């Protein structure tokens, strides 16, 4: 059906170094393998070779020339990461050489590497910056990291000792700069970027055994604690988006955890890495398989910010490591999803360019346009994504077919021919005849040039599929479980065939938050999208899909086979019934927008199932002890949900759940001792939530969280009030002389006294003196779209030269869902979500009582003083926050001085937007207390 490629040369396996690996990987690349990928992916690989890899250095000669000009005048004005371009290009090109044994590419790369090596300074420096700046600033260590990766990959593929020696000289200079002296890698700044050098240092240490490389890795590990803190947060179960450095570059630091595991065998590194990978998958992997929103993790797969190509490539590299580390089929599922959708969606089918941003909805723009600020004379097409995107295709040779040390592990289900060797050196020829992912029928034929051989082959059964039939030689049949490998151990003969039948039924993922009322639609692993090019109506007129008629959708395959195939044609079209008897034609995401037309993959729909819950507590890997343990998951904004079910299974068994709680109406439940009687001490368990609604049910996002039951341990999850009070109250505290709430949880009170309130009654308010005193409450309800806060305030003094917080829920830089601030004797309502938003200031006086409220209602934030609206400002409809606490009189997490000398009374925080009338009522009298009624629940 598609253009097939000829013979290709492929990956060497794991290169054997001089350092024995104490931490073992479960899967490895097949040594000396040859791959020939066919089908649509093979066509994209060929286009990438012809239109980019062979011509990029000639069209952008500054890729190498910048290294020669580093000490010339005038000093080149480069972007801080310019040193990465040659390294990223080299990694991508060598990986492509593994796939296409192209004489021209091999000769081209030999010359490229030879020229690159001549630009290394006598002291070992290999970067584009002047002598005064070497390794000390910019992203210079980051550039050296990518150059080392490229040269080590070239050395692994060719055995070029000069490339390895160049890496050693680079590493030696880095060690001279940052070992045994006052300087630390931390001092270079741009921490998540420059500290990624730990990854390439680990590879180089395993190859050479040079002790100082490991010593520097250990020093970087210490510096992590002041930067990304990847090890400690991973062990503590902190979600990746809530770590100090959630930018995408940190994923390459996480690869350093795998190197530390391989070198030391200490389980903490493996545990931390796995936690972060799982956390990213649950909270920040978009339905296209792409990672990041605005170049970092934000804790929502529904956010609409840019999905950068470099971020997705880093996610692919991280997922290859996860697959090798754990052998879990889930990691291979993720690699397939991201490759077929986000990665191929980022590449134009012509092979001429890659995007910077491949959004779920929007247009495809060449990175050379979107981030043109990176271009310079001599490098008109170079930017981070242009040189990095091709790596997504090259990585296929790392995971398509692997070995577990016994036999073969087949992850790639598409067409192609593969020349492989078993661990004992036995040659195996494998041919895959299929139109997958367009067809669910896959047929493998095995050839054994040396005669019959006994070994296992493991076939991946995708997690999205139904139980699948696997048939040997059109006879013996087995059933493969979704999300697992089916292993077949036998004496194989030349001509043996194995056939896999996958059901490519349409499936749905409902959206939440920003994507509420919308769905993503898949056919097998392929994400579908509306494209102007295939419909006579434009995006504003896009009708809602009628999901009750999903079975009536019609699939067609318009692409013509052969060498004259139209590369701009979609792989498939799906005519989907829509509202009002209309029909919407959907194409594969990889082809959507390739002609410059607008596209959408979050699609409006009728009769939606609930969105999949995302588990929150207990954190992954927790120890659950005696007493009550709260299980919590994301709240919903989708009206199609009616109830939840909680299921708990033993981690290593296929038996049914040992705990099942039905008809739950809140996104949390407390498991008491009675329910825990089914749990065995020391046993590991996984738990899952099923959201149920009138139009179907859906399981929580994979991977499921895990916990170990230990009746002798103290549970890591403190019991809190997760339920909202009347009026969606999160916290309500009268503050009559003490901070105890009538609803919610007081986490800590760092000093206070009682004081007269607005009516003059004694002990009807609390007083904070300013230097260190504040009241901190648990933020157990989600602040997302609509919420309000109100409190009576009397300033005792105004902060001079700084701000003071009446109320703040600050969680980190540019992450505060709401704050009421005093600055320069003025009162402000503010919000930080990626950027700062602030009302104008309202003058306030010391010694006077004010009722202050801030209300966020969708896209508006309004500041009220004494019941009157002072100003409304536009803000994001949905706020993405990591906040888990709020404070009165200070900032709950900021170590600096934002304290306020103030008297406070009647504090309320609610997870809904108050009306103007409700605010006036709260401000009108200091008499019956609003919102409390006769009920109360607090800690």
Regions found by a protein language model. Give the residues of each.
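Well-ordered alpha-helical segments within folded domains of soluble proteins
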Residues: 79-98, 139-155, 190-206, 245-262, ...
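C-terminal beta-rich recognition modules with glycine/proline-rich loops and embedded aromatic residues
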Residues: 273, 333-341, 346-448, 481, ...
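Solvent-exposed loop/turn segments flanking beta-strands in beta-repeat/beta-sandwich domains
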Residues: 636-652
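Extracellular glycan-associated modules
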Residues: 713-939
């Amino acid at each position: 059906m598609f253009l097939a490629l000829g013979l290709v040369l492929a990956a060497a396996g794991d290169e054997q170094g001089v350092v024995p690996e104490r931490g073992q990987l479960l899967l490895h690349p097949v040594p000396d393998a040859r791959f020939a990928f066919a089908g649509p992916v093979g066509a994209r690989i060929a286009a990438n070779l012809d239109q980019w890899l062979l011509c990029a250095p000639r069209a952008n000669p500054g890729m190498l020339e910048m290294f020669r000009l580093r000490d010339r005048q005038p000093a080149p004005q480069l972007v801080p990461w310019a040193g990465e371009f040659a390294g990223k290009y080299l990694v991508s090109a060598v990986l492509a050489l593994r796939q296409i044994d192209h004489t021209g590419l091999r000769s081209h790369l030999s010359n490229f590497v030879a020229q690159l090596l001549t630009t290394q300074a006598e002291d070992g420096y290999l970067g584009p910056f002047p002598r005064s700046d070497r390794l000390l600033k910019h992203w210079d260590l980051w550039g050296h990291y990518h150059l080392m990766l490229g040269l080590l990959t070239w050395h692994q593929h060719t055995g070029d000792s000069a490339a390895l020696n160049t890496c050693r000289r680079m590493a030696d200079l880095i060690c001279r700069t940052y070992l045994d002296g006052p300087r630390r890698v931390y001092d270079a700044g741009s921490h998540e970027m420059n500290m990624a050098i730990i990854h390439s240092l680990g590879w180089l240490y395993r190859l050479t055994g040079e002790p100082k490389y490991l010593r520097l890795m250990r020093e970087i590990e210490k510096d992590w604690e002041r930067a990304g803190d990847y090890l400690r947060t991973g062990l503590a179960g902190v979600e990746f988006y809530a770590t100090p450095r959630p930018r995408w570059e940190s994923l390459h630091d996480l690869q350093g955890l795998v190197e530390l595991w391989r070198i030391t065998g200490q389980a903490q590194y493996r545990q931390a890495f796995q936690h972060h990978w799982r956390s990213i998958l649950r909270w920040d992997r978009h339905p296209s398989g792409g990672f990041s929103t605005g170049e970092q993790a934000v804790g929502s797969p529904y956010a609409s910010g840019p999905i950068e190509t470099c971020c997705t490539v880093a996610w692919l590299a991280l997922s290859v490591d996860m697959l090798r580390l754990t052998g879990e089929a889930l990691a291979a599922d993720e690699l397939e999803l991201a490759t077929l959708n986000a990665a191929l969606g980022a590449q134009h089918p012509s092979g001429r360019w890659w995007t910077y941003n491949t959004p779920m909805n929007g247009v495809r723009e060449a990175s050379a346009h979107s981030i043109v600020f990176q271009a310079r004379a001599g490098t008109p097409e170079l930017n981070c994504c242009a040189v990095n995107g091709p790596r997504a295709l090259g990585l296929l040779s790392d995971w398509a077919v692997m070995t577990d040390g016994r036999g073969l592990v087949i992850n790639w289900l598409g067409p192609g021919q593969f020349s492989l060797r078993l661990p004992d050196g036995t040659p195996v020829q494998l041919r895959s005849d299929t139109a997958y992912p367009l067809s669910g029928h896959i047929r493998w034929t095995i050839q054994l040039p040396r005669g019959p051989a006994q070994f296992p082959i493991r076939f991946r059964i995708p997690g999205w599929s139904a139980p699948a039939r696997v048939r040997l030689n059109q006879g013996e049949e087995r059933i493969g479980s979704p999300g697992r490998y089916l292993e077949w151990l036998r004496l194989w003969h030349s001509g043996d065939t194995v056939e896999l039948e996958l059901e490519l039924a349409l499936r749905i993922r409902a959206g939440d938050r920003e994507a509420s009322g919308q769905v993503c639609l898949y056919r097998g692993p392929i994400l579908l999208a509306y494209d102007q090019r295939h419909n006579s109506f434009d995006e504003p007129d896009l009708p809602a899909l009628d999901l009750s008629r999903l079975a009536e959708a019609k699939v067609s395959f318009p692409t013509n086979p052969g060498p004259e195939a139209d590369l701009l044609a979609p792989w498939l079209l799906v005519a989907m019934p829509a509202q009002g008897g209309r029909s919407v034609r959907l194409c594969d995401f990889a082809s959507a927008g390739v002609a410059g037309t607008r596209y959408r993959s979050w699609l409006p729909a009728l009769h939606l199932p609930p969105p999949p819950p995302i588990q929150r507590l207990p954190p992954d890997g927790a120890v659950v002890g005696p007493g009550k343990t709260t299980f919590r998951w994301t709240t919903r904004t989708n009206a199609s949900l009616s109830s939840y079910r909680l299921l708990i299974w033993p981690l290593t068994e296929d038996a049914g759940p040992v705990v099942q709680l039905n008809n739950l109406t809140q996104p949390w439940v407390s498991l008491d001792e009675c329910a825990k009687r089914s749990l065995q001490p020391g046993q590991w368990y996984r738990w899952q939530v099923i959201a149920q609604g009138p139009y179907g049910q859906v399981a929580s996002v994979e991977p499921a969280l895990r916990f170990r039951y230990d009746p002798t341990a103290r549970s890591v999850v403190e019991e809190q009030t997760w339920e909202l009070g009347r009026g969606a109250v999160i916290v309500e505290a009268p503050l009559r002389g003490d901070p105890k709430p009538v609803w919610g949880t007081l986490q800590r009170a760092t000093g206070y006294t009682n004081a007269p309130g607005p009516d003059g009654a004694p002990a009807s308010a609390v007083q904070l003196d300013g230097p260190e005193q504040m009241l901190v409450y648990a933020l157990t309800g989600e602040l997302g779209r609509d919420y309000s806060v109100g409190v009576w305030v009397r300033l005792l003094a105004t902060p001079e030269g700084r701000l003071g917080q009446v109320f703040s829920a600050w969680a980190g830089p540019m992450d505060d869902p709401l704050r009421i601030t005093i600055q320069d004797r003025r009162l402000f309502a503010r919000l930080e979500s990626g950027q700062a938003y602030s009302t104008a200031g309202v003058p306030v006086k010391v010694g006077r009582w004010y009722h202050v409220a801030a209300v966020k209602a969708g896209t508006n934030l309004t500041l009220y003083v004494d019941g009157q609206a002072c100003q409304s400002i536009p803000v994001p409809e949905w706020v993405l926050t990591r906040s888990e606490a709020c404070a009165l009189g200070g900032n709950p997490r900021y170590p600096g001085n934002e304290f306020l000398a103030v008297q406070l009374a009647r504090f309320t925080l609610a997870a809904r937007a108050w009306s103007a009338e409700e605010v006036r009522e709260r401000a009108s009298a200091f008499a019956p207390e609003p919102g409390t009624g006769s009920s109360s629940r607090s800690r």
